[in-house]
């Protein structure tokens, strides 16, 4: 099935929030396919390990980009690392310390 939406999520030391964020993205109810691309910018609080666990549990849905060195501090745009993975016609964004409370958010935005 063709990917309609790519959800881009950036994280850095979002350990207290990332599980709720990812669960809210996975809970989306749509009649189209979507993917989640998570970029972790070398977190030191266990965020990257959580992201990796989710990517392994949902390999068809979540793609993880895990940095060993913080790219933002080097002046790099972290979206450069996500761009090659994007397959969706549309892009949505949810930061790693945020979440979506409406399980039909994507469906409403696309249709």
Predicted regions and their residues:
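Nucleotide-sugar donor-binding/catalytic module of glycosyltransferases
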Residues: 1-111
């Amino acid at each position: 099935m063709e990917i309609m939406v790519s959800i881009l999520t950036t994280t850095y030391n979002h350990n207290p929030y990332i599980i709720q964020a990812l669960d809210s993205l996975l809970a989306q109810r749509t009649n189209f396919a979507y993917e989640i691309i998570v970029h972790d910018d070398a977190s030191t609080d266990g965020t990257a390990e959580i992201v990796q666990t989710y990517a392994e549990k949902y390999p068809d849905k979540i793609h993880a980009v895990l940095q060993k060195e913080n790219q933002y501090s080097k002046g790099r745009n972290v979206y450069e690392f996500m761009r090659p993975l994007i397959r969706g016609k549309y892009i949505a964004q949810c930061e790693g310390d945020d979440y979506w409370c409406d399980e039909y958010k994507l469906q409403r935005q696309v249709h």
